[in-house]
Every structure is written in structure tokens, then in C-alpha cells.
Curated annotation (Swiss-Prot):
One GO biological process term: phospholipase C-activating G protein-coupled receptor signaling pathway
Cytoplasmic side, ranges: 46-58, 119-135, 209-251, 308-338
PANTHER family referenced in this protein's UniProt entry, alphabetically: HISTAMINE RECEPTOR-RELATED G-PROTEIN COUPLED RECEPTOR (PTHR24249), TRACE AMINE-ASSOCIATED RECEPTOR 1 (PTHR24249:SF415)
Protein family membership: Belongs to the G-protein coupled receptor 1 family.
Cysteine-cysteine disulfides: C4-C177, C12-C87, C95-C181
Domain of life: Eukaryota
Keywords: Cell membrane, Disulfide bond, Endoplasmic reticulum, G-protein coupled receptor, Glycoprotein, Membrane, Receptor, Transducer, Transmembrane, Transmembrane helix
InterPro entries referenced in this protein's UniProt entry, alphabetically: GPCR_Rhodpsn (IPR000276), GPCR_Rhodpsn_7TM (IPR017452), TAAR (IPR050569), TAAR1 (IPR009133), TAAR_fam (IPR009132)
Coiled coil residues, start to end: none
Subcellular location: Endomembrane system; Endoplasmic reticulum membrane; Cell membrane
Protein name: Trace amine-associated receptor 1
Pfam families cross-referenced by the UniProt entry: 7tm_1
Main subcellular localisation: membrane
């Protein structure tokens, strides 16, 4: 049986997977990391370079892309080694730094999603006062909260060792070992992490997007009723309103679906594992962590790839046109359709 540390009686057990299995895992996780880095970097470069994209909403998306890029750059590579080897080769201090950074950036990404839902609510439901309510100052506050709260929560919990408060005996007797870097939560810290990083921002997203859907549906019905009264282009207008309603439902479904599929399994296991006496296998926990990482991989696709300006910006980046003079002033969309 292979071990992670020279002193066998205190060492974590290394997995005994074949080289082919290990190589396949490395390839898959490296692909996820590369996709995360490239997708979010394109969003960062696009919004930074093109002046037409310098809007409060886009700076919020830019900040989220930065969080997701850092997650792919600073966290995922080390998690890849830990997941493939079931060992941690980078020391106990760096384990704490890595775990804190992981929790911070993952939570910050979810916080950004929550604030973007608030932005979309005012854009759809209160368009006349949208620019007054969601200005650059408000967005700066959103960005500050999205970074600072997860940072204080993550680094405070890990470095003060609050994550296994009340379960020290279980942790040091049955979980802790040399050459490992597992994320451990007690009953209290597991519930706290679930509430802070998932339930509260997730509930905000769910309630707001459901409200947006109801209002969009009501607006589509009002347009349909007006068309029936006026009897002008009824069939065409009705088709358009139904198409818009279907598109709204599809977009909101994708947003919530990706978020829930990626993060719900991990946080549910995090909150129930202490109550099940830590019977969830570490391998399953690793898989669920990577499912959560996938949310940062998909964020550029869900929140940026759907924007009309993105395809043109992507084409200009790929063909090197952003290096041309005054390319930053290029019009990516008509002002009325932004």
C-alpha cells in the first residue's frame, strides 16, 4: 500500500490507481483548467480593452471573470495534483493558504452571480430607473462585498481553525494525516459555510430570477392583450412575444441550472457529512469539488457568450485586431441595443 509520507504510521494513504487512470484524470482536469483560464481571460481582455464595454454592469462581470480566472490559475492546479494523487506535496502552511483561497474564490464567484441577478432584476423590471439605481458606485460596493466577505470568512475560518471547532477529536484521530490536505467541516462550520457561500446567495438568485420570469411573462401577456385589442399584426406579434417569453425562460433556466448542478451537490454533502459521521468517501468529495469548479468554467459561456458583443470581440481578439490603432473605440453593438 503506497503512502504519502515517509513516516507510515502518521501518513495519508496514496491511491493505487494505474498510470493510465492517473494520466486520464490529469488530462481531464487540465482541460477544465485551460478552458476556465481561456474563457475568463477573453472576458477580462474584452471588457478591459473596448471602451464601449466600460459600463457598471460589465465591470461586475469583469470582476467575476477575474475571480474565476484566479481560481483556475491559483487553486485548480494544486487541487488537480491532490485529486489525482490523493496526496499533498506542498506543505501544511500552503495547504491552509490553498484551502482558504479555494473557499474565498469559490464563494466570491457565487457572490458575483448573486449581485448580477440583482443587476438583471433592475434592468428588466425597472428599466427607466436602472441607470440611476445601478451606477458605478453601487457596482463598486457590490464588487467590494463580493471579494471582502468571502476573504474574511475563508481565511478567518481556516487560519483560526474554526472549521473543525467542536470536532477536534474526530479530526485529529480519524481525518488528519501527514501528506494530506482535506477540507474538513464540523457540524457548525459546515452549516455556516452552507448558509454563507451557497444558501443565502443562491436563494437571492432563485427569488430574483423567478420574479424576473413572472414580470417578463406578465409583460408578454400585456403585449399580447394589446395586440388583440388593436388587431394589428396579431399573429406576428403574438409569435414574437411567445418567442421572447421562451427565450427568457431558457436563459433563466440555464443560469439557475448550471449554478445548482455545479454547486448544490458539494454544499449538500458539506452540510450533511458531519451528521453522517463523515461517511462520505474522500473521492466523492473530490469529484463534487470539481463539479463546483466547473461553474467558473461555464460562467463566461453563460454570462458573456450570450451577449451580442462577445462574438465580435472574440473575433477581434483571435485575429489580433485589438492591436490595431483605435481598436478600443470599435463599436461592438448599436447603443440602442446594448
Amino acid at each position: 500500500m503506497p503512502f504519502c509520507h515517509n513516516i507510515i504510521n502518521i501518513s495519508c494513504v496514496k491511491n493505487n490507481w494505474s498510470n493510465d487512470v492517473r494520466a486520464s484524470l490529469y488530462s481531464l482536469m487540465a482541460l477544465i483548467i485551460l478552458t476556465t483560464l481561456v474563457g475568463n481571460l477573453i472576458v477580462i481582455v474584452s471588457i478591459s480593452h473596448f471602451k464601449q464595454l466600460h459600463t457598471p454592469t460589465n465591470w461586475l462581470i469583469h470582476s467575476m471573470a477575474t475571480v474565476d480566472f484566479l481560481l483556475g490559475c491559483l487553486v485548480m492546479p494544486y487541487s488537480m495534483v491532490r485529486s489525482a494523487e490523493h496526496c499533498w506535496y506542498f506543505g501544511e502552511v500552503f495547504c491552509k493558504i490553498h484551502t482558504s483561497t479555494d473557499i474565498m474564490l469559490s464563494s466570491a464567484s457565487i457572490f458575483h452571480l448573486s449581485f448580477i441577478s440583482i443587476d438583471r432584476y433592475y434592468a428588466v423590471c425597472d428599466p427607466l430607473r436602472y441607470k440611476a439605481k445601478i451606477n458605478i458606485l453601487v457596482v463598486c460596493v457590490m464588487i467590494f462585498i463580493s471579494w471582502s466577505v468571502p476573504a474574511v470568512f475563508a481565511f478567518g475560518m481556516i487560519f483560526l481553525e474554526l472549521n473543525f471547532k467542536g470536532a477536534e477529536e474526530i479530526y485529529y484521530k480519524h481525518v488528519h494525516c501527514r501528506g494530506g490536505c482535506s477540507v474538513f467541516f464540523s457540524k457548525i462550520s459546515g452549516v455556516l459555510a452552507f448558509m454563507t457561500s451557497f444558501y443565502i446567495p443562491g436563494s437571492i438568485m432563485l427569488c430574483i430570477y423567478y420574479r424576473i420570469y413572472l414580470i417578463a411573462k406578465e409583460q408578454a401577456r400585456s403585449i399580447n392583450d394589446a395586440n388583440q385589442k388593436l388587431q394589428i399584426g396579431l399573429e406576428m406579434k403574438n409569435g414574437i412575444s411567445q418567442s421572447k417569453e421562451r427565450k427568457a425562460v431558457k436563459t433563466l433556466g440555464i443560469v439557475m441550472g448550471v449554478f445548482l448542478i455545479c454547486w448544490c451537490p458539494f454544499f449538500v454533502c458539506t452540510v450533511i457529512d458531519p451528521f453522517l459521521h463523515y461517511t462520505i468517501p474522500p473521492t466523492l468529495n473530490d469529484v463534487l469539488i470539481w463539479f463546483g469548479y466547473l461553474n467558473s468554467t461555464f460562467n463566461p459561456m453563460v454570462y458573456a457568450f450570450f451577449y451580442p458583443w462577445f462574438r465580435k470581440a472574440l473575433k477581434m481578439i483571435l485575429f489580433g485586431k485589438i492591436f490595431q490603432k483605435d481598436s478600443s473605440r470599435c463599436k461592438l453593438f448599436l447603443e440602442s441595443s446594448s
